[in-house]
Structure formats: C-alpha cells, structure tokens
C-alpha cells in the first residue's frame, strides 16, 4: 500500500498584460475564502498602479494584500495556519521567489502565483519560466490584440504612442497608458538608437 502525504502545490497564472491574470488570481482566492480557507495575499511594493495594499484587476476587482519589497519578506509572516497563499505580479521579484514558493508548497500550502511570462521584447520574463517549470498547474491566458482583434500573447510597450526600443529598461510599471496586448504579427520592438547610428 502506498503512503499518502499531505503536501501543497503551486498554481501558475500567466500571459500578457490585460489577459485577466489578476482577475483569475482574485477569483481563485475568493473561492478559497468562500470555502472557509485562510488566505493570505502578497504583492510587490513596486506595483502601486491601483492600490498599495490590494491586488486590483484592470476591471476594478480587488482583494486585500500585503505589500512587500522583496520575496524573502514572505517568510517573515506567520503562515502556519494559512491554507492558500496568493502572489501577484511575481515577475517583479528576483529568483529567490522560486525557492520560497517551493518551500511554501512543501510545507502544505496551496500557492497561486500570477505574472507576465514575457517582457515587452517578447522574451522570457524571469523568474516566471522557472515558476512555470515547478508548478503542478499552469494556466496561460490570452488577451485580444489591440490592432487586429485576434488572440494576443504579447505585451506591447508604447512610449508616447510609439513602440519601445529593445534596450529600454525591462521594468516600467504601467497600465493602458504604456502597454497594450498584441498578437505575434503586430508586436513591435524598435531597434536601439545605437543600432541606427551604426547603419
């Protein structure tokens, strides 16, 4: 006979901006609350677009959250009786978040992370690829391309209405004033100014 062990697991919600990641995170967390589970939510301090102490979707749905500056702060909280741990905008944390999430799940918690899988250049946005690899469940959501209306898997960064340059900083917190969803065909990354001088 096999022994069974009580262990947690990791759920990963990912996709482009405006694909409903935070909305899906909030939905899953609210289901946990409805089931009388103890739920704790964390979000990075850098994300202050809508509210400092709430995870807020672009549609305005919200859930209370603990604002943290770095991933290690999660472990300073007493999570002994917590059933479900939610972490939004996980791409804003360093790689330490991966080992923390794995420890939390090994300790019996259901851990739900949400964040971008690609940066504005269409390249993997660490640490999300690593989190996807260690997750028991991965949900990849798509938005609607702002240009053609097809499914979008990419996030277009716009600076004054023009595509961002490839050498622009990876992190720029913003919403629809700086970003829009795009399909592969309509996703544009402008060359750096240095490349123009070399041509």
Curated annotation (Swiss-Prot):
It is an enzyme of class 2 (transferase). One of its GO terms (cellular component) is cytosol. Its EC number is 2.7.1.21. Signal peptide: none annotated. It is found in: Cytoplasm. It catalyses: thymidine + ATP = dTMP + ADP + H(+). PROSITE patterns: TK_CELLULAR_TYPE. InterPro entries: P-loop_NTPase, Thymidine_kinase, Thymidine_kinase_CS. Keywords: ATP-binding, Cytoplasm, DNA synthesis, Kinase, Metal-binding, Nucleotide-binding, Transferase, Zinc. ATP binds at residues 15-22, 88-91. The active site is at 89 (proton acceptor). GO terms for molecular function: ATP binding; thymidine kinase activity; zinc ion binding. Zn(2+) binds at residues 145, 148, 183, 186. One of its GO terms (biological process) is thymidine metabolic process. Its main location: cytoplasm. PANTHER family: THYMIDINE KINASE, THYMIDINE KINASE, CYTOSOLIC. Belongs to the thymidine kinase family. Homotetramer. This is Thymidine kinase. The gene is tdk.
